[in-house]
Amino acid sequence: MKIVNIIGGLGNQMFQYAFAVALKKENPDEAVYVDTHHFNYLFVKKYKTSNLHNGYELDKLFSNIDIEKAPISMLMKVTNYIPNFFLSRVARKVLPKRHTEYVAKLSESQTYIPGILSLAGNVYYEGYWQVAQYYINCREELHRAFVHPKPNEYNARLIKEITNSNSVGIHVRRGNYLLSPTYSGICNL
């Protein structure tokens, strides 16, 4: 069984989903899940995380996302992890140790790791997986998955207005800097 942790903003979620699709293609006879429990309200509230952006967005923005979310029972089989810090500590002490390969790839080391898609046994993947080499064999599946649904009436009117005029869009990414104690005060608009 393979589980890919999904966390971060939309771009990171798309990379992680793509990695899960690549895992599924490389291991067709094995179950592949994504772990979205970090977007759970209680987790966010307890750990006061501010890096979860708009929550889990893939299902909201793309109509062809096709991968199962790992239920807590699957996480327990692979990691003894329960989305509650206290219960996880108890589970790790009481339950038998799981023989799980835990793979964490730092976002700073954006290098391709040969063979990582074909690790045997239970594997929990945590990282951003932002290297195109992982997805070479599943390009078509990703193109089908990342299709926006048909715009609703309001958005269709906006699209028409934008295309019929000289429009400029500006995006200021200030949330990361406004809320983070590390970067506070850099962007104080």
Language-model region placement:
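Extreme N-terminal starter segment of soluble prokaryotic enzymes
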Residues: 1-3
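Short, well-ordered coil loops that connect the C-terminus of an alpha-helix to the N-terminus
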Residues: 29-30, 64
